[in-house]
Curated annotation (Swiss-Prot):
Annotated GO CC locations: extracellular region
Protein name: Scorpine-like-1
Function: Has antibacterial activity.
Domain BetaSPN-type CS-alpha/beta: 54-94
Organism, as annotated: Urodacus yaschenkoi
Subcellular location as annotated: Secreted
Domain of life: Eukaryota
Keywords, comma-separated and alphabetical: Antibiotic, Antimicrobial, Disulfide bond, Fungicide, Secreted, Signal, Toxin
Pfam families per UniProt: Scorpion_toxin_alpha-beta
Protein family membership: Belongs to the long chain scorpion toxin family. Class 3 subfamily.
Paired cysteines (S-S): 57-81, 67-86, 71-88
GO BP terms, alphabetized: defense response to bacterium; defense response to fungus; killing of cells of another organism
Amino acid sequence: MNTKFTVLIFLGVIVVSYGWITEKKIQKVLDEKLPNGFIKGAAKAVVHKLAKSEYGCMMDISWNKDCQRHCQSTEQKDGICHGMKCKCGKPRSY
């Protein structure tokens, strides 16, 4: 069960990152298909967090190295993921 859920999450990240489906469309489908409650709220929160990801950053890792490329091209600094955000030249202090 956990493996299937993880695969679905990563497939969702891929689809959303390429812009085929936007966060707004996914949130609308969740509103229509899921009953109000914990599961709906959790699913909407996961979709929102994944949609906020910058330059492929997830869990402090830039999976496709877009953060590094972005920072090298704009500021000539190292790109470092801080959670879901990409920061140029700011090392993690934890």
